[in-house]
Amino acid sequence: MAEKTLRVQQIGSPIRREASQRQTLIGLKLNKLHRIAELPDTPSVRGMIAKVHHLVRVLDDAA
């Protein structure tokens, strides 16, 4: 069975944000506005998305 994935797009700038939020975006493979990353649907990835929810948009959510 195929592993579930999430597509996440960066919609906010990390400029003037806490260093931990900038590092979280890097961990999500996002480094420029409007970039899209396809990530595995795991609790750790969902936690990272929740931490920077104001900077990213989930494009399709399988769950």
UniProtKB/Swiss-Prot annotation:
Cellular component, GO annotation: cytosolic large ribosomal subunit
GO BP annotation list: translation
UniProtKB keywords: Ribonucleoprotein, Ribosomal protein
Keyword Repeat: no
A molecular-function term among this protein's GO annotations: structural constituent of ribosome
Entry-linked Pfam families: Ribosomal_L30
Family: Belongs to the universal ribosomal protein uL30 family.
Subunit structure: Part of the 50S ribosomal subunit.
Stated name of the protein: Large ribosomal subunit protein uL30
Organism: Methylobacterium nodulans (strain LMG 21967 / CNCM I-2342 / ORS 2060)
